Amino acid sequence: MEILWFIPTHGDGRYLGTQTGGRTADHLYFKQVAQAADRLGYTGVLLPTGRSCEDPWLTAAALAGETSDLKFLVAVRPGLMQPSVAARMASTMDRLSDGRLLVNVVAGGDPYELAGDGMFISHDERYKATEEFLTVWRGLMRGETVTYEGDHIKVENSNLLFPPKQSPHPPLYFGGSSQAGIEAAAKHTDVYLTWGEPPEQVKEKIETVKKQAAKEGRTMRFGIRLHVIVRETEEEAWEAAERLISHLDEETIAKAQAALRRADSSGQKRMAGLHNGDRSKLEISPNLWAGIGLVRGGAGTALVGDPQTVATRILEYQALGIESFIFSGYPHLEEAYYLAELVFPLLPFQNERTKKLERRLGEAMGNDHFARGKKAKV
């Protein structure tokens, strides 16, 4: 099991839909979140990509020097980046971070945003371009001299002079719910990512991807992208969830949903279909809450509950075949601590940093002794 956190380079706060309780999204805050995740034992952090975010490569490079063990899941963008340039960027980042790079392959899902970046090809053509990109990128990272001509990419005698730290290259993560996306993932990538859908839908998707990978003679790992709201009691957790969206009015929700409907991403459509913009039907599966998706693109669901309940839901996904969990929560600094301190001890997730959490003592009682801890069980 690996557990990643999230660097909120598109903004953060205590509430959605208002500047009340908002936080300045700058390097100092990103560093706080990254260093907390590093100290708490998270495997790594995801950096989002797109016009509403700070550049993920520059942000990851800045944070790598502020952390020691934390890995960085950073996006390459086929169609917006040439594979040779992306290979040099990834190789440099992997070497300078001493092998702490993970690569997120993002084909894009919003034609309006992509047009602003100069990309005008259709949904399925984007995945063809992605396959061409990865054919060249992987060859370069393996140390090959690549000559290739496809419908979207052409290179002659391209090579990489400085190899990455990880061999043959950093792991490739990929999410795509359409058939074209699944085919691209099965041919080229290492970890297939799904949004936080109900377990029965996740199970179906995993089976589909496994079959496609088998046709390619490959096996894959699987990951899931979720928010989390965990508190010491169920009541506190659900109160926190309702408080998070307490400033959202119907006009704000409608405007956000209209913007999200521009997307031609199958995954985004599946996310929107979980709630259809209706705030009265947000618990779509036990402890799986779709409130964040009322106004947020991409990951729109959260596990909500007390530590035992959240751990149980995580283990249910693990039983389906999920190995990589990518979480986030509002505000990201505080929720990183809630998840690590309350839930990590209940999971089969350990490293030298999480072991330090188990040795925490709290404050001395009466300047004389430390309280004895009690470990909950799932």
UniProtKB/Swiss-Prot annotation:
NCBIfam families: alk_sulf_monoox, PRK00719.1
Protein name as catalogued: Alkanesulfonate monooxygenase
Chain's gene name: ssuD
Record lineage: Bacteria, Bacillati, Bacillota, Bacilli, Bacillales
Taxonomy, superkingdom: Bacteria
Matching Gene3D superfamilies: Luciferase-like domain
Coiled coil: none
GO molecular function terms attached to this record: alkanesulfonate monooxygenase activity
InterPro entries, sorted: Alkanesulphonate_mOase_FMN-dep, Luciferase-like_dom, Luciferase-like_sf, SsuD_RutA_monooxygenase
Family designation: Belongs to the SsuD family.
Pfam families named among the record's database cross-references: Bac_luciferase (PF00296)
